[in-house]
Amino acid sequence: MFYTLLFTGLRRSEALALRWRDVDLVLRYISVNRTLHQLNDKSFVFRQPKTEKSRRTVALPPFLSIVLRQHQESQQKQRALLATAVSDDDLIFAQLDGSPLLPHSITNAWRRLVKQAGFQGVRLHDARHTHATLMLKQGVNAKITSERLGHSSVVITLDTYSHVLPGLQEAAARGFDEGLGRTTQDVISSTG
């Protein structure tokens, strides 16, 4: 699940609600159309995503497609031991019997993993922030990054990740010079 959060920028509640029919491992995309929440009485409820723009299709990198295929095969083997089959309506991330994972158990597993790796203060939601930051640093258009995250507008993405933008401004300025075929030495030579 952690790979999915990091490589797609999904929210925890969105990933927990994914069914196998929501993913296409051949065309490599995930359809986000619901979220999973645990109520105070310990029951689960599926809800509409946070905003209309949160209902979205997110392209999968090839690596994640392979990881999810392996996860699906593992899940099928585990279910075979229980004499049950995995269906398209089954949750991708589930207990052995197919029931939903507890949201707080995912967060606790993340904390243990982070601690074992020697990091402190890295929250599960930071996987989403890392995804967005890396997308923007790689020069991915802010609109595309916003769509992947399911933000209601690109303004939210730009406001949230403005710390990434100063370096991008400098890179864009250098890129403009390079696009015109000019170097710093050319400018010095022509003005000197």
Regions from the language model: what does each represent?
Residues L27-N33, R123, L134, S146-V164, ...:
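Short functional hotspots where side chains directly engage DNA or cofactors
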